[in-house]
Swiss-Prot record:
Its EC number is 1.2.1.38. It is an enzyme of class 1 (oxidoreductase). The keyword Amino-acid biosynthesis applies. GO terms for molecular function: N-acetyl-gamma-glutamyl-phosphate reductase activity; NAD binding; NADP+ binding. Pathway: Amino-acid biosynthesis; L-arginine biosynthesis; N(2)-acetyl-L-ornithine from L-glutamate: step 3/4. Keywords: Amino-acid biosynthesis, Arginine biosynthesis, Cytoplasm, NADP, Oxidoreductase. It is found in: Cytoplasm. The keyword NADP applies. This is N-acetyl-gamma-glutamyl-phosphate reductase. It catalyses: N-acetyl-L-glutamate 5-semialdehyde + phosphate + NADP(+) = N-acetyl-L-glutamyl 5-phosphate + NADPH + H(+). PROSITE patterns: ARGC. It comes from the Bacteria. CDD domains: AGPR_1_C (cd23934), AGPR_1_N (cd17895).
């Protein structure tokens, strides 16, 4: 059994990692840390796990984590991950980092959008952990930067078109909606029930921190720099992301041709489901799963293509994708511990 540590496990992503790994046939959770909950039993913080795990939260002590584990998931805030990840790598541990600290390869871009980077020497080594695009690199990696939730839904939605140079990359407009769990578990006024329920708003317009990550990945797919107009919105639901991407086609294509392109591109991907022509995704149909559902439509009147992509932001957008990456890094079946179907309704 692989001994696994989850560093920073008191948030929604952390509890989802615990839940998934408790059901993983090749993993034993040996260390779970939390600064604010150190010393508390895990099931006292997360009653949903009662009777399934007999551990307490450890403080974030690097030496203890190294001693107790073979593989480390870091689910810490941005800037906090880079303070501990180098030590884990130096000790010979493989790491999947769920923060943004190693997603951007250009240190200047990271520092423009986040803060000073204290281990920039690892940025070139870190593999961007979107298996459907970078599977072999993940297999060979010791440090995987788990993608953000919005970028995951967007990159999977646009990859077939950008890989085949079928759209004008300069025309890209991306409109995304996320459930409130994307804002995390910490208390804040904007996440209160009365602030969110029955409301719907845009936020981070032209300034969301996922923008450079989106542009980096889309640029790699296109083989040239890409800039996008990206507007996220807050949905009054617990979980789920729906991204609608718009782009101008460089040559006429009808919906049937586009659907065939997507079906062929993702034919071998167990976690990407392409909808038949005439059907579009719903976040309700991926909730609680590692699936990404995609639908595509040609707007002949405007010469544009419209792609709709949905994921569970806490799973394919975070925890289950991290487990998928671990499976690849360990040369295990990619869907090990991830075979649950979505919850419905």
């Amino acid at each position: 059994m692989l001994k696994v540590a989850i560093v920073g496990a008191s948030g929604y992503t952390g509890v989802e990692l615990i839940r998934l790994l408790l059901n993983h046939p090749q993993v034993e959770i040996t260390c779970v840390t939390s600064r604010q909950n150190a010393g508390a039993s895990i099931d006292s913080v997360f009653p949903s796990l009662a009777g399934r795990i007999d551990l307490t939260f450890d403080p974030v002590d690097v030496d203890t984590i190294i001693r107790k584990s073979d593989f480390v998931f870091t689910a810490l805030p941005h800037k906090a991950a880079m303070a501990v990840v180098p030590a884990f790598l130096h000790a010979g541990k493989k790491v999947v980092d769920l923060s943004a600290d190693y997603r951007l390869h250009d240190v200047d871009v990271y520092e423009a959008w986040y803060d000073k980077h204290t281990s920039p020497e690892l940025l070139d080594e870190a593999v961007y952990g979107l298996p459907e695009l970078y599977r072999q690199q993940v297999v060979d990696a010791r440090l995987v930067a788990n993608p953000g939730c919005y970028p995951t839904s967007i990159a999977l939605g646009l990859a077939p078109l950008l890989e085949n140079n079928l759209i004008d990359a300069a025309s890209l407009i991306i409109d995304s909606k996320s459930g409130t769990s994307g804002a995390g578990r910490s208390a804040k006024v904007g996440s209160l029930y009365c602030e969110v329920n029955e409301g719907f708003k845009a936020y981070g317009v032209a300034s969301h921190r996922h923008t450079p990550e989106i542009e980096q990945t889309l640029g790699q797919l296109a083989g040239k720099p890409v800039q996008v107009s990206f507007t996220p919105h807050l949905l009054p639901v617990n979980r789920g992301i729906l991204s609608t991407c718009y782009a101008s086609l460089v040559q006429p294509m009808d919906t049937a041709q586009l659907q065939q392109l997507y079906a062929q591109r993702y034919a071998g991907e167990i976690f990407v489901r392409v909808h038949p022509q005439g059907e579009l995704p719903n976040i309700l149909h991926v909730r609680g799963s590692n699936y990404c559902n995609i639908g595509v439509v040609s707007d002949k009147r405007t010469g544009r293509v419209i792609i709709v992509s949905v994921i569970d932001n806490l799973l394919k957008g975070a925890a289950s994708q991290a487990v998928q990456n671990m499976n690849l890094m360990q040369a295990w079946s990619e869907d090990s511990g991830l075979s649950d179907l979505p919850l419905y309704p």
